[in-house]
Amino acid sequence: MKQGARFLKKAAGAPANVAAAINRSGGRARLAAKVGHDPFGEFLLHTLEAEGIECAGVTRYATPTTLAFVGLQDDGERDFTFCRGADGELCWQDIPADFLEDVGIVHFGAATGLLGGELYVTYQRLLHEAKRRGLLIAFDPNYRGGLWGQDPQEFIARCTPWFLQADIVKVSEEELSFITDVKTSTEGCRRLHDAGFSYVAVTCGRRGTWVSHRDGMQELIPSVPVDVIDSTGAGDAFIGALLAKIVQSGCTLDYWQ
């Protein structure tokens, strides 16, 4: 990052990426978030609305909009630097009373949501309310060392209750490895199922996605071959498309449990 000479502004944030992928896959997404009263916040709101995302749960705050700087490497991989801001101030009073009405799945990401503070409290209350209503819960740990430090143990401890509450868990190969302390997706998923996880999708880059259900079903679904330019948001696009198709398939909560 310190060698960078050019910066290109892009709308992002994992939950917003997922919401956009849901809409582009034929679903309907609504988002709870908080942005600043600044040009970046205005840009994000405009982009969300252009994607057709329901934004009644997106509010403004005096704190500047959270920024993520992504440094691209030659192989398409990234390094991240974060400037936390308004996203951490999302409070329960910002969530519309009807936010969970006519909703099939509630998706949570952990990049900043589990760091603590007001956003963390709101996350917990929203999860509790979604479970009370019997809604399907999806969770993506979305580990970023720049937010949690290089020792993932605190991150794992924060994520574990969410893993156990989720019906669908999406992880990368790297996340699965350090969460379970094993190297293979087969054994890693088995450990998660033994701990109570229902359905796990492991994104494996160009090789595809390893899907595993605790009833014993495991399968590698190949990816469509592409030339990798920038992998930022690839996992978000995947889980967004998956969630849209799950709703469209009409699968019930009992199936995922």
Locate the predicted segments by residue.
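Conserved N-terminal subdomain of the carbohydrate kinase-like
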Residues: R28-T112
